[in-house]
């Protein structure tokens, strides 16, 4: 299980990355993150939904309701143009940060 603070700090880029592919509802986002991470990333809905609401307030995502043939309506989220710009910036930042961490950890003998 990953450190909770690492997951929390990565939520924005994870959500925007997935929503850049297609609109998804909250539970679908949780499942997709788990699936793609080999179930290493077990994001709790209590972490995800406040992040979704914040991203929506910031204008990075928008939401809409969709009727279901069976079961209750689902609230889907989609990335906005502003969200795509933020995703591009955060992806560059992540790449720089990740490379820096790898260099530091390798230099100190902590990363293989």
Swiss-Prot record:
InterPro entries, per the entry: ArsR-like_HTH (IPR011991), Tscrpt_reg_PadR_N (IPR005149), WH-like_DNA-bd_sf (IPR036388), WH_DNA-bd_sf (IPR036390)
Domain of life: Bacteria
Disulfide bond sites: none
Sorted UniProt keywords: DNA-binding
Stored Pfam families: PadR
GO terms for MF: DNA binding
Name recorded for this polypeptide: Putative DNA-binding protein YwzG
Organism the protein comes from: Bacillus subtilis (strain 168)
Primary gene name: ywzG
